[in-house]
């Protein structure tokens, strides 16, 4: 009989800071739209169970090392990305611009998520790798475009000058476009023969939907139109829309695609969709917190950029302490979606939620 995940064996008690505020009602709208209730942390009482930062269980029987797992998966993804890009040829500049951003490192959270989910439902790394690389290509494309002067006007990304600072705005736009096209080409060509055609079509549709006007693009549009708005005139519903679409949508797609490629059941796919939606929002809440609590050197990108741009963020809307409470609750709700899966196979995903909530960059 399969062993199920026990949250208590991956828990660490963290005392919530400050007093709980029971006056925020608009946060509850998220549960209606997503089937989740991450913001219910705003009305919670007492301490919360959290996972240790390195993803290691407090249970002496568990030897899972998430840090090592993450390093190994990142190495596999980096190697696959390196060979996925065609050899340099004319026009050289755009090829160099593509490689500059795609191979700049990073935590590779999205491809790791795709692979871990595929393995959880019975697949393997080889089956998921092309899709995982496609997700990272699209993520990198979105970062290149997001950093442009007409968008966020950022100078640093992953500790290096942004693409347009090195290659110019025109070449950065084209590099982002090229990565977007390469993602779908790579995913479909490399996976041919590994995955049934109907599953591949479903995965492609899932990914396309996540980055179009029903996903990432929609989030970016609302994000840009919300700059300089008075936070007192904007509810949490607008902020949650931005983050559900701009950040969570691609993480959700990474998980769902991994489940599809691995042959997951409909029930498994939906549970993992909810899990990814939780960690997607969690990722952005933590990102908002880090933007106002860490330095540029620590983040590898310009700290305080969102504040300077007048963007809507969780700390700006509900304060730093309540933002931490929301992050804490999201991590717990993500873990809850993994109940019923084999504990050994689910361990990377349990630890990933912890890693995102505890990350410092």
Swiss-Prot record:
Catalyzes the trans-addition of the three molecules of IPP onto DMAPP to form geranylgeranyl pyrophosphate. Isopentenyl diphosphate binds at residues 107, 110, 139, 158. It catalyses: isopentenyl diphosphate + dimethylallyl diphosphate = (2E)-geranyl diphosphate + diphosphate; isopentenyl diphosphate + (2E)-geranyl diphosphate = (2E,6E)-farnesyl diphosphate + diphosphate; isopentenyl diphosphate + (2E,6E)-farnesyl diphosphate = (2E,6E,10E)-geranylgeranyl diphosphate + diphosphate. Transmembrane segments: none annotated. This is Putative geranylgeranyl pyrophosphate synthase 8, chloroplastic. InterPro entries: Isoprenoid_synthase_dom_sf, Polyprenyl_synt, Polyprenyl_synt_CS, Prenyl_diphosphate_synthase. One of its GO terms (cellular component) is chloroplast. Its EC number is 2.5.1.-, 2.5.1.1, 2.5.1.29, 2.5.1.10. GO terms for biological process: carotenoid biosynthetic process; farnesyl diphosphate biosynthetic process; geranyl diphosphate biosynthetic process; geranylgeranyl diphosphate biosynthetic process.
């Amino acid at each position: 009989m399969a062993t199920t995940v026990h949250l208590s064996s991956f828990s660490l008690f963290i005392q919530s800071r400050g007093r709980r505020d029971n006056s925020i009602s608009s946060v509850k709208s998220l549960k209606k739209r997503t089937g989740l209730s991450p913001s219910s942390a705003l009305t919670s009482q007492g301490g919360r169970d959290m996972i240790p930062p390195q993803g290691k269980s407090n249970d002496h029987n568990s030897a899972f090392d998430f840090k090592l797992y993450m390093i190994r998966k990142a190495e596999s993804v980096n190697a696959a990305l390196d060979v996925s890009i065609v050899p340099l040829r004319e026009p050289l500049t755009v090829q160099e611009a593509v490689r500059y951003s795609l191979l700049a490192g990073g935590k590779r959270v999205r491809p790791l998520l795709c692979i871990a989910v595929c393995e959880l439902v019975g697949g393997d790394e080889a089956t998921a790798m092309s899709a995982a690389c496609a997700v990272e290509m699209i993520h990198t494309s979105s970062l290149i475009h997001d950093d442009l002067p007409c968008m966020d006007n950022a100078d640093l990304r992953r500790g290096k000058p942004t693409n347009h600072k090195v290659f110019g705005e025109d070449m950065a736009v084209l590099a982002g476009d090229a990565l977007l096209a390469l993602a779908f080409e790579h995913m479909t060509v490399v996976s041919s023969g590994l995955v049934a055609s109907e599953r591949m079509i479903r995965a492609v549709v899932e990914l396309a939907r996540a980055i179009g006007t029903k996903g990432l693009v929609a989030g970016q549009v609302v994000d840009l139109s919300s700059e300089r708005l008075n936070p007192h005139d904007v509810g949490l519903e607008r902020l949650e829309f931005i983050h559900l679409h701009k950040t969570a949508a691609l993480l959700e797609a990474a998980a769902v695609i991994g489940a599809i490629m691995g042959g997951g059941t409909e029930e498994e796919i939906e549970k993992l969709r909810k899990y990814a939606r939780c960690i997607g929002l969690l990722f952005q809440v933590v990102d908002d917190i880090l933007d106002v609590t860490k330095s540029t050197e620590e983040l590898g990108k310009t700290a305080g950029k969102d504040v300077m741009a007048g963007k809507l963020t969780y700390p700006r809307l509900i304060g730093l302490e309540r933002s931490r409470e929301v992050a804490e609750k999201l991590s717990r709700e993500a873990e809850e979606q993994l109940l019923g899966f084999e504990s050994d196979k689910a361990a990377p995903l349990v630890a990933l939620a912890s890693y995102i909530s505890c990350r410092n960059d």
